[in-house]
Every structure is written in C-alpha cells, then in structure tokens.
Amino acid sequence: MKTSVDAATLKEWIKAGRKIRIVDIRAPEQHGASRIPGSENAYISAAIKQGDADAVNRIVGEAGVPIVTVCNQGGSCRLAADLLRERGVEAYSLEGGMQAWLESQAGP
C-alpha cells in the first residue's frame, strides 16, 4: 500500500476534485505564511515529535475520507500518517513536505 504522495500527485488529486482532507500539522504561523489550497491547520507536529502518538486523534475525521498530512520537509507528516494508519485511517504523507510543494509550484 502506498503511504505517501508526491506534490504532482497531490496537485492532480486537488484538480480532479478527489475527496481528501489535507491537514497541515505545522505551526499556525507557518501555515499562514504558505499553505496548500484547501488545507486545514492542526498543529500537532511538536506533540508527535515528543512522543505523543495520541495527538493524531485530533485530526481523525469522517470515515472513508483519506487524509494527506503536510509538514515542513516530510518527516513529521510521515510519522503522523503512520499513526493515523495504525488507527484505521487511510492516510498519506506529502513526500518532501511543504518544501516539495513550494518547489513544484515554482515551475521549470
């Protein structure tokens, strides 16, 4: 099972109107400075890094709606997606995080 998506795939999913939740787990000020259209902010990355696996319970949503987690460079969101999958949620992390997303938007 695929556990992550790259920026190009996420962009295609958004364009196609695929029903997904994009959850940015970075701090609110980071989400405010740069964000993926349609994403929501749930600052849990620090809690996850400190070993609070239950922090992901705050972002579990509607059953059957996949979640794509986003962080700065891909590490924290990968862990968040792993923890969500342990709870039975279809979850993916954004490969390379927001950095990869921003680079994909810059074009050639």
Write out the residue ranges for each language-model feature:
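Rhodanese-like catalytic fold shared by cysteine-dependent sulfurtransferases
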Residues: 1-21, 28-66, 75-108
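Short, surface-exposed ligand- or partner-binding patches at beta-edge/loop junctions that are enriched
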Residues: 69-71
